Structures are given as C-alpha cells and as structure tokens.
Amino acid sequence: MHVLKGINLDIEEGEFVSIMGQSGSGKSTLLNILGILDNYDSGEYTLAGTRIWNLSESKAAYYRNRMIGFIFQSFNLIGFKNAVENVELPLYYQGVGRRERHRMAMEYLDRLGLAQWAEHYPNEMSGGQKQRVAIARALITKPKIILADEPTGALDSKTSVEVMQLLKELNREQGMTIVVVTHESGVANETNKIIRIQDGIIGNIEINEDHNASPFGINGYMK
C-alpha cells in the first residue's frame, strides 16, 4: 500500500513550514522520510545538497545527528538524566568532550530561560519546560533543519502559544529552517507556509505570511 502518492515538495533554507493533515493522511510518513527514519520506494529526496536514499543504519544515524534536530510531542527526554545531560546527549554521540558539551548545553538552556533548571529531572518539570529542554537538545548540534512532530500536542493552550512563539523567534532571528507537523489549524497558522496533505497527496500549499489563515485568525486560539 502506498501511503504517499506522487509528493512533489520543495522546502527552502530558512522557511517556517507546517504540514497539516488528519490522522492517516500521510503526514507522519512524510516526516519520517524527511527525518531519515524511513526509506521511500521511488523518487528522490535531497537534504542540504545530499541525496538521501537507501542508507545503512549507521549512515542514516550519522546524517540525522549532524543535519536534523527533532522535537517530539512526548518530549522523549531520558528520565534518569537531568536537563543539561539530556541536552548534551547529541554531542556525546558526536564525540564532543565532556567539558565542552556541558558548556554548550548550559548555553542553550540559558538561551531558552532554563539555566536554573539544568540539574532538574524531567519528572520535576512542567510540560512547557520539558519541551524547551527538547528544543535546546534539537538545536545544540546546529542542524540544517528542525522537524517538530506535533510539538504542542501534549501542552495546554497557553504553553502551546509560548512554544510556537519560540519556534517563530528561532526562524526569524537565526534563519532556522523549521518544519512542523500538526493536525491543529491554530498551530499551522503560526507558520509562514501551510502544506495540506490528505490521503497521501498534497492538496494545496498556502502562503501565510500574515498568519491569518482560517479558522483561527490573528486573534484566535491555539486549540
């Protein structure tokens, strides 16, 4: 069974994009291909000039670690490691020394307003704090692209707005390429381009620079 059918998609460096669709639409499969978690049957996927195709697991892990930052709905923090240790982890796999990776992790936690929470464990933090730790972990390798899979799905409305504002700032101030997968119109409305996918096919692509896509609008709610 083909989950995706004839997808033709370009995401330029520095774009802030959402891929929107209901459960079963194919958006998660597309994200897994973009994140080098799944292979594809035909066609071509190029990431930052590198063709991604039929890689060994070690090569796929190498590219993921150096080119992609992941943000997950469930945060995917390691429960027995504190915040700074969780943020350090991608650098550990890159072979960065302990002192340097600790310094860098503290720098990113400080940027996200969490320096004072560095020694706290995930079960001691709120959902918003855990997602900020996850964002710091995604950023620390200076990836080419951030892939955020339902990043507000486990958060309340207020915290969802804060997380999306943070992603907007990263895109605007650092030129970070960010792709958000969501089924929520309010989340998609915060991005500059909305790609709607249904039954494995891209329905339409909406430029959303004014952030007033229906049904939420500028004064709407996140959920």
Residue positions per predicted region:
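ABC family nucleotide-binding domain
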Residues: M1-I197
